[in-house]
Structure formats: C-alpha cells, structure tokens
C-alpha cells in the first residue's frame, strides 16, 4: 500500500468530499460536525497548509494546519477513511508545518472521540492546556507536540 499526497487548498473537490465524510462521522460520534471550528475562506496559503492523501488515485485522508501564534500551528479537520492513511497524513502535515517555520502543533478534539484521542497519543501528542475557544469546555481535550526538525 503506497500513499501519495498533494498539497491543496480547502476548496479542492477531494478535500471537500472527505470533509463531508468527516462531518457525517463527527455528527454520529459527537452530535456536532465541527464545521464551525474551521472557515476555509480564512485559509492563508503563506501560513496555512492543507493536504489530501491518495491511494490508487482515490482520496482517502485529509487535514489542515493553520497559524495559531508564532511558531505554533493548529491541526484541523483531520480525517482518514483508510487504515494507515491517518498516520502518513499526520507525518506529512507535520513536515509541511516545519517547512513553514512551525515548531509546535496544537489541536483539540472531543473527549468522546476516543479513536482520535488514542491516535494522537500514539503519535506522541500530549494533553495540554486548553486554548482559545476551548478554554473551559469540558467536552474538549487539547493536545500539543513539539515538531522535530
């Protein structure tokens, strides 16, 4: 199984198709699509990154990072519908973020989304202080990781 990836913008049709799948999945898990946490029109190509993963020319995973503060990016809208694609995607997003000068990645997910929580822990993300709109929101859990150069 050999994955390929493409750096795209959030309006790319394959990204949009995968995000529709993500929204359905999140609604089933959390009763919320999470759409309000990411506005694709706010995507700034000089600071942000968006990747779609492919297997045999079929889009199987996607994710975004966006500027949070100096040297810190926030991972958003991570989704995979193929075993193994999520790990490869995360690595590519981290490498892309490093290319853009980021040294740390942060993210938030719902505590009830145990699959996501386990995934991030398995990839060396540690629980961290809540940030931004997640401060005081008990249903959310925030993670961070120092990006290795």
Q: Language-model features: where?
A:
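A generic structural signal for beta-strand entry/edge sites
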Residues: 70-72, 104, 140
């Amino acid at each position: 199984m050999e994955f390929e990836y493409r750096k795209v913008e959030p309006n790319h049709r394959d990204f949009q198709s995968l995000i529709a799948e993500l929204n359905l999945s999140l609604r089933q898990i959390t009763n919320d699509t999470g759409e309000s946490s990411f506005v694709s029109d706010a995507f700034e190509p000089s600071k942000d990154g968006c990747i779609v993963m492919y297997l045999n020319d079929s889009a199987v995973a996607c994710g975004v990072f966006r500027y949070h503060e100096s040297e810190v990016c926030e991972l958003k809208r991570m989704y995979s519908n193929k075993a193994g694609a999520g790990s490869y995607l995360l690595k590519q997003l981290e490498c892309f973020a490093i290319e853009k000068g980021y040294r740390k990645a942060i993210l938030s997910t719902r505590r009830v989304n145990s699959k996501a929580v386990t995934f991030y822990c398995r990839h060396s993300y540690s629980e961290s202080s809540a940030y931004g709109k997640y401060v005081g929101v008990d249903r959310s859990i925030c993670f961070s990781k120092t990006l290795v150069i």
